[in-house]
Amino acid sequence: MNKFEDIRGVAFDLDGTLVDSAPGLAAAVDMALYALELPVAGEERVITWIGNGADVLMERALAWARQERATLRKTMGKPPVDDDIPAEEQVRILRKLFDRYYSEVAEEGTFLFPHVADTLGALQAKGLPLGLVTNKPTPFVAPLLEALDIAKYFSVVIGGDDVQNKKPHPDPLLLVAERMGIAPQQMLFVGDSRNDIQAAKAAGCPSVGLTYGYNYGEAIDLSQPDVIYQSINDLLPALGLPHSENQESKND
């Protein structure tokens, strides 16, 4: 029996699932840290902070940077300089700086993963409504989808500012299913992190976990999605469609 035979719609996470956004996010984080004369983190470290929205990203970046600066100053025999500066105020300033810099680098620092456009096109052609659920700040979402030429595939888009509770809370997924006019158990959710899988489970949606995204350095199988795929186009045969690589061969 096909586990997904009752699926009537598919929703996707964005960062780490459809797009590699780490270069742009890391650049904006580091520019914001540098502007506050804090140590810069680098892409490899920033990747481990992605997934819970910009506010949490700033909190993680600031916590690391303050600790890193304190350690460096201690090794130099210098006193700490952050004790009298409220972390909450620094997070607020860091977020403003991040938003400014990310608006400048988001498009050039974000790339579609392989087979994404073909997979979305095949699902849309099958008549399945497609949704997007991301914790990314809403103002960045639509311009990015347009720049990547994938906005046309989605009938419902939920950004991080569109709901009070972000993933892993089920609210964003439940809202997408409601707008699609289907039950949560009829909507497949595809993501790359434990937040995605936890949200799907809480909403009652079947889930696909992808192995290539930003899952805090954890293997996606630890979150126990219903199915694990190495590539996004592995989703197509499970939904009764030819694999996109096979489809491309037919079109050549």
Curated annotation (Swiss-Prot):
Its cofactor is Mg(2+); chloride. Mg(2+) binds at D13, D15, D192. One of its GO terms (cellular component) is cytosol. Gene3D superfamilies: HAD superfamily/HAD-like (3.40.50.1000), Putative phosphatase, domain 2 (1.10.150.240). One of its GO terms (molecular function) is metal ion binding. Disulfide bonds: none annotated. It holds the Pfam family Hydrolase. One of its GO terms (biological process) is DNA repair. It comes from the Bacteria. Keywords: Carbohydrate metabolism, Chloride, Hydrolase, Magnesium, Metal-binding. The active site is at D13. Its EC number is 3.1.3.18. Pathway: Organic acid metabolism; glycolate biosynthesis; glycolate from 2-phosphoglycolate: step 1/1. It catalyses: 2-phosphoglycolate + H2O = glycolate + phosphate. PANTHER family: PHOSPHOGLYCOLATE PHOSPHATASE (PTHR43434:SF1). Specifically catalyzes the dephosphorylation of 2-phosphoglycolate. Is involved in the dissimilation of the intracellular 2-phosphoglycolate formed during the DNA repair of 3'-phosphoglycolate ends, a major class of DNA lesions induced by oxidative stress. Monomer. Belongs to the HAD-like hydrolase superfamily. CbbY/CbbZ/Gph/YieH family. This is Phosphoglycolate phosphatase. It comes from Shigella boydii serotype 4 (strain Sb227).
